[in-house]
Amino acid sequence: MDTLTRFLPEHLQQNQLPEALGGVLLSVVSACTEINAKVRLGALAGVLGMAGTGNIQGEDQKKLDVIANNIMIDTLKANPAVAGLASEEEDTFVSAGENGRYLVLFDPLDGSSNIDVNISVGTIFSILAKPEGALATESFLQTGRQQLAAGYVLYGPQTQLVFTFGHGVYVFTLNAENEFVLTKENPKVPESTKEFAINMSNRRHWLPPVQQYVDELLAGETGTRGKNYNMRWVASMVAEIHRILMRGGVFMYLQDKRDPSKPGKLRLMYEANPMALILEQAGASASNAYQAMLDIQPESLHQRVAVIMGSSEEVDYLNRLHSK
């Protein structure tokens, strides 16, 4: 089986991609390998619990949020090809290599609310080309279609790296020697599914299209959809999307009635766009209920967005309910 270091040069050459772009991916992987070691030790390393600080989103930070964020920033700033970074945990962008050609955006520890109870978490990342001119916030505000690469590392029962350069999706598993080994090429998400993922505790806040959709799913084979569905909910986007990538399903985190000014909870740049690129490469769909996720023009670094992702039959159906 190919290791990442053997696979990557050949993949870059086959698809006429710059070696420096592969180097940025390797920097991300190096950082994630270090984060993995911290996650694995947990309480033994004293890294669990709250940090006593908050991020730009107004969310309380866990110790591992801060640790993972610092590891990502320090590792990526050491790569001269990286011009700038944007993190879910930082107020604004971070400048890096003066002559760098790439921008990296990331959620250093997605699902960190689960870390103290030993449920899977992960790191999500996106790589963009740096536009000409001085680095500014606007440099990062590119659509998801402009991503050069996207991926995530899942810290679960196995530690797995999933990424795409826009030429298929590849899954690597970390072995005992701390090397990522290719274990799956080009997974495909089935068009139809019998699984859905949503936080049912928010049901009373949902908008009518979501209420109708979930009611139809719960009606089972005697309802309008004509089949029985199972619900899943981990409260860790990386874990939810990885399950969908491996066996299908649909994941939803949508706008609701609690705050009409807030389109959703998840971040477009750090979470939705990278996951959308991976899923589209695997034959799935992703939208904000009204347009394809990858076509949304971002207006700010920390922009939130409604999310529907997964098996295209379900995404398309829920999109149609929103358009009525």
From Swiss-Prot:
GO annotation, biological process: fructose 1,6-bisphosphate metabolic process; fructose 6-phosphate metabolic process; fructose metabolic process; gluconeogenesis; sucrose biosynthetic process
Subcellular location, record wording: Cytoplasm
Binding site for Mg(2+) 2: D107, D110, E271
A single cellular component GO annotation: cytosol
An MF annotation (GO) of this entry: magnesium ion binding
InterPro entries for this protein: FBPase_C_dom, FBPase_class-1, FBPase_N, FBPtase
Assembly and interaction partners: Homotetramer.
Record protein name field: Fructose-1,6-bisphosphatase class 1
Organism of origin: Neisseria gonorrhoeae (strain ATCC 700825 / FA 1090)
Gene: fbp
